[in-house]
Amino acid sequence: MSIKLQPVKGSKDLLPEEFGKHDYIISVSRNLSKLYGFQPISTPIIEYTEIFNRTLGKDSDVLSKEMYVFLDKGNRSVSLRPEFTASIMRAVIYNNLQNKKLPLKYFSSGPAFRYDNPQAGRQRQFHQINLECIGDGSPFSDAEIVLLAYDILKKLNLVDKVNLEINSLGCMESRAKYQQALVEYFSKYRTELSQDSQSRLIENPLRILDSKNLHDKKISASAPSIHDYYTIEARGYFDKVLEYLEFCGIKYTINANLVRGLDYYCHTVFEYVSTQIGAQSTVLGGGRYDGLFEQMGGKLASGKKMLPAIGFAAGIERLALLTNYTPVDVRPIVIIPVDEEYHQHGIILLQKLRNNNITTVIDLQDSISKRLNRANHIKASKVIFIGAIEMREQSYRIKDLDTSNECVIIHNELLSYLQNNCS
């Protein structure tokens, strides 16, 4: 009986070239985040399900349709993380990090899981970069997180392929008034709304604005705008965020229907979107989530009522679809001892070159011609031969595989030669 060798639907093997793209995206993001004062953090892929039940919103597609939920052997409900923010906030509360010097700035990356229909740029197992700034409630913090996202996209040469859409969901008072207006508006179209939107009408009408159903979108196009329901404070906050973005030269479009897909957002929400990757147009998105800490049971020693926070995540697969980056293969040096008696000397040289950060392999089997063929196959730049003459003269015969030229280099000059002549 044969076994299934293909990956589980919605997952895929990351082969070297694509892995190189992912690694580059993560490296660029991590390095830029360091310049902004972010530190690395890692949380488990698996969490107790209640972490997400309390944070994502029961009306969200993620919680109602897309979660990977299991009972473990102890009959505990656990889930594969569908996103990072709730896990990061859990880690903050569990490790009592909120009482350290604020703000906390964290960078993380890794896989997440959603039981969704696989398509370009979205698998059921996907990968994200994730950045969270916890403890800063200023408008500049919002602008700075958008600016960091912009800098990452710029470094990846993607700023010309995306557009920034931004909105404000206002404060709690703003949202309460706006939600009532939405209920009154959408109630007139109740029977025309999709089944999902009908169920959200009372619980969370904001989520109807995020519906992917085309008919829902047509109805939402004429819905009241949240901008008409801001308190003076909420409007002033959003205006200040936009002022900072303009000062930093960041172009944006205000999208009044942008609400993001999770319930913990408030005030600023934003997305960088592209028209080049099909239906999954959002490549990066985030926003402010000031109430999440308290919602998860967090308490501040200072007695303050709220721990403000803002962050964003970007899908690595989607960024990889857009970027033109091609991983540069490091071309190795191949050591070929011509006879077995020179194997030990070859191994000593192998370790020496690796200790000096020169990518090197050694080939000890088969004829010289077969070993040369293998060296060409792995795109080696040079071959170092070790034989009787070389041992006697304390030298190495080196063949350049691009030109087929050969030269002889004495032992103590080999390192400088390779460092100056290897691609």
Swiss-Prot record:
Q: Where in the cell is it found?
A: Cytoplasm
Q: What is its EC number?
A: 6.1.1.21
What's the top EC group for this one?
ligase
**What catalytic activity does the UniProt entry give for this protein?**
tRNA(His) + L-histidine + ATP = L-histidyl-tRNA(His) + AMP + diphosphate + H(+)
User: Which molecular-function annotation in GO is an example for this chain?
Assistant: ATP binding
What keywords appear on the UniProt entry? Aminoacyl-tRNA synthetase, ATP-binding, Cytoplasm, Ligase, Nucleotide-binding, Protein biosynthesis
Entry-linked InterPro entries: aa-tRNA-synth_II, aa-tRNA-synth_II/BPL/LPL, Anticodon-bd, Anticodon-bd_dom_sf, His-tRNA-ligase, HisRS-like_core, HisRS/HisZ
The processes (GO biological process) annotated in the record are:
histidyl-tRNA aminoacylation
One Pfam family assigned to this protein is: HGTP_anticodon
Q: Which family does it belong to?
A: Belongs to the class-II aminoacyl-tRNA synthetase family.
Check the record and name the HAMAP family matching this protein. Answer: His_tRNA_synth
| Assembly notes | Homodimer.
Which protein is depicted? Histidine--tRNA ligase
According to the entry, what is the taxonomic lineage of the organism?
A: Bacteria, Pseudomonadati, Pseudomonadota, Alphaproteobacteria, Rickettsiales
